[in-house]
């Protein structure tokens, strides 16, 4: 089983990492190519391209300037400890043991606009480059064209080491990021968990809660060493419960009612 997550815009380089082990990202050469292109942009270009504030554009202009193809604990941090958004509050990697993180290293992947595909312990230098950014490059009009089938092939290399029910991809990424994966070329079926909360008289996806729940699901897989997708139906963290009637073989729906 491989579970894929989206990255986070918010980053934490202040909190010291509680583990020393780390690995190097697989697509450093590709990331370097993107950085070379990003360095040609002015802060105003970055603000316009990414629809961000001038201070944030200046911050990322400097990040691109500082970025190095050499990764060390001095200039980078393990990805799953550096990302700090809703998904990663749910995953809460800083409270996982080194043994748990070793398991996550084999079963969790993070999709990234700059780095393509990251393992949890891959070193990450600070950046901002969302997968949906229409950043024209030598390979095409945007990052989907840039990555092509590279991410899918990298996932297949991992999936092909699994067998039976364990050869499955669990999609806990956003639509924007999972578009970088080509399901028809995958060497495994895809299961997408969907998290819904009761609000306004019906169940609906509430972005903040759904993002957090994706991280909780990834943690559930890691802590329980899950390899069989049927075991995902036992997920019941923070009030969610699997709804068989609303689910099918490729979409697992989890619902909850809070405060009723």
UniProtKB/Swiss-Prot annotation:
This is UPF0246 protein Bcen2424_2223. It comes from the Bacteria. InterPro entries: YaaA. Pfam families: H2O2_YaaD. Belongs to the UPF0246 family. GO terms for biological process: response to hydroperoxide. GO terms for cellular component: cytosol.
